Amino acid sequence: MSDRNKEVKEKKAKHYLREITAKHYKEALEAKERGEKVGWCASNFPQEIATTLGVKVVYPENHAAAVAARGNGQNMCEHAEAMGFSNDVCGYARVNLAVMDIGHSEDQPIPMPDFVLCCNNICNQMIKWYEHIAKTLDIPMILIDIPYNTENTVSQDRIKYIRAQFDDAIKQLEEITGKKWDENKFEEVMKISQESAKQWLRAASYAKYKPSPFSGFDLFNHMAVAVCARGTQEAADAFKMLADEYEENVKTGKSTYRGEEKQRILFEGIACWPYLRHKLTKLSEYGMNVTATVYAEAFGVIYENMDELMAAYNKVPNSISFENALKMRLNAVTSTNTEGAVIHINRSCKLWSGFLYELARRLEKETGIPVVSFDGDQADPRNFSEAQYDTRIQGLNEVMVAKKEAE
């Protein structure tokens, strides 16, 4: 076998997923250089709109996570604070606002925006974040307002409200970019998006096996593609390849998790990107693997028609009632035979962290699994204590081991 053929044969899904992310940024930069209008987009803004129009957008949340993971989160956060923003403001927002102020990013080059696409189903603070960008740069902001849903289903009046904004966003983006909506293309994008979402969720579902065929932190790394390229065939193919690899790992007893899986845990919250390696290393020390999370799977948006598409964007984790949010976690724990939980009290994400103390109490009460929490931040390393985290994980391990010995 030639070296070239060997390389192709051995190429894994993770390599294709990295290439998709790199291509995403490259194409946006090239579009900007050609004089096309490009935008910054919220992670749970309906991606079907920009994809159908062929408009290039980048995702500040993805970008801020990459900057933080590469060790530059603190510098960017401090720059934003020097601009007048409080340390209490979301770390992703501070990183992104610093990039906006500087006008470029050394860590991961991105084009400056000609418009912003905002959606508040994952974060209410995002409205003010994007408003500031729009005002500072004097560019249009398109907002799709998703009402907080306290019900078990999404009512028809909510669907109509979201649909009206969806249609208006298309018209606004047509005017801004000069591109025209193609209904046939939209149908194709929806079909591909469903294929991507189903394969992504299929890959995540293999965590139910003991041992899990993958390290739970793999999902956090691969999630960027679920955000930025869900409507592309490349993403659908790569996620199918990933799911197939995990399926094969189940059959052969292999796993991307290094070492023996001794404990299975739920990880609740956004990853602390500046300390991702430290967190993973400490969990691995006790043989703990993340087998349950709702964060990564939040981008597996499933629908069969337009009404269901509107409803799907009203059912993401941060736009639903506490009881429904609890049900998501209970299902994640019970469906994967998870035995403990680690909860990230994220100083950047008030909307998410605000209910986590009660979630921890109810989760422990209704499942009987031990739960610990730690303080941290998704982008600002100053809000994370290695010593506190290490002590909490050590304590969780002791309780989990004692429970097993008592059974």
From Swiss-Prot:
Keywords: 4Fe-4S, Iron, Iron-sulfur, Lyase, Metal-binding. Its cofactor is [4Fe-4S] cluster. This is (R)-phenyllactyl-CoA dehydratase alpha subunit. The keyword Plastid does not apply. Its EC number is 4.2.1.175. One of its GO terms (biological process) is L-phenylalanine catabolic process. Pfam families: HGD-D. Residues 1-4 form a propeptide. InterPro entries: FldB/FldC_alpha/beta (IPR010327). Part of the heterotrimeric phenyllactate dehydratase complex FldABC, composed of (R)-phenyllactate CoA-transferase (FldA) and a heterodimeric (R)-phenyllactyl-CoA dehydratase (FldB and FldC).
